[in-house]
Amino acid sequence: MNRNTLDFIQSCIATIPDYPKPGIIFRDVTSLVEHPQGFHQTIELLKEHYQSMSFDKVVGTEARGFIFGAPLAYALQLGFIPVRKPGKLPRSVLEQSYQLEYGEDCLQMHCDAIKPGEKVLVVDDLLATGGTVEATIKMIREAGGIVEHAAFVISLPDLGGEERLTAMGVNVLKLVDFPGH
């Protein structure tokens, strides 16, 4: 990947200190999608990286995974599957719980969205601890899908998400790293 393009993408991501609480440094990916060239270059880099690989579907996690997953699916001429919070999908769903810092949350996916044996690329905006994407991968695998790749715009490497997903047999692509929390 072109280092200048990656640096440009990183420069489009705003850093907000003390949000949502004191001591947290928030990486605001919405500033990237507000920037037409930054957003375009992000999707182009992801497309260039994955276009020679074989996938049947792209899955994006709620909500910012939709922002990057849907245009990437379009660029790769693949279907897009949204993974949502409970109560947002109208048909029969698979469900997977995952741990938060203070409690538990849940994700859902339509039962019929992925057929057994389909190869799936998972996309999200940010990789921190990896809990959300781990839950997503478990659902895809429960449906019989094959997940070997996950893509992220931002990674917070100090939080261990890449190691968590690698332990599941998933190759992780991240465009930019921001050290710290």
Curated annotation (Swiss-Prot):
* Keyword match Cytoplasm: yes
GO terms (BP aspect):
adenine salvage; AMP salvage; purine ribonucleoside salvage
> Known Pfam families for this protein?
Pribosyltran (PF00156)
- PANTHER family cross-referenced by the UniProt entry: ADENINE PHOSPHORIBOSYLTRANSFERASE, PHOSPHORIBOSYLTRANSFERASE DOMAIN-CONTAINING PROTEIN
Highest taxon of source:
Bacteria
| MF term (GO), any | adenine phosphoribosyltransferase activity
Q: Which gene encodes it?
A: apt
Say which family it is in.
Belongs to the purine/pyrimidine phosphoribosyltransferase family.
Per its UniProt record, what InterPro entries does this chain match? Ade_phspho_trans, Adenine_PRTase, PRibTrfase_dom, PRTase-like
Give the pathway.
Purine metabolism; AMP biosynthesis via salvage pathway; AMP from adenine: step 1/1
Q: Which HAMAP family match?
A: Aden_phosphoribosyltr (MF_00004)
Q: What is this protein called?
A: Adenine phosphoribosyltransferase
Organism field: Tolumonas auensis (strain DSM 9187 / NBRC 110442 / TA 4)
Q: What does this protein do?
A: Catalyzes a salvage reaction resulting in the formation of AMP, that is energically less costly than de novo synthesis.
